[in-house]
């Protein structure tokens, strides 16, 4: 049976939680406290989007994701800045229950089988904005992806 969940989103940019992927207005300087607030207010999950631009920013974001995972009693889903299998590993080791592959990026589609076999289908999620990717990559999604996230 398909199930819909209330998933709160945190967009990390330069150490803060910002409004969304395009608007970097700061909504919280303490993303872990924001995540705890969401958890205490009936979120089924928290999705964290790492918007870092450099390796140093990415490592700092992973430290924040660790704090978020510790602050939450619900699963944390890690997304953003995935370029290779190592990035999925880092998200999972930071405490994320699952990691997201962005199906708007060919490089993420190309590593689907590899990361699913390495970490297990249950740990891998795909995000998409264009529904045509669902039919275009149907077999890959069914075999190697546990969940889908529609980004709109």
Q: Where are the model-predicted features located?
A:
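Conserved N-terminal beta1-alpha1 strand-loop-helix module at the mouth
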Residues: 1-74, 82-86, 121-126, 130-150
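Glycine-rich phosphate-binding active-site loops on the catalytic face of alpha/beta enzymes
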Residues: 53, 89-111, 149-152
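Short, glycine-/small-residue-rich phosphate/pyrophosphate-handling segment
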Residues: 106, 118, 127
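C-terminal helical cap(s) of enzyme catalytic domains, especially alpha/beta-barrels
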Residues: 110-119
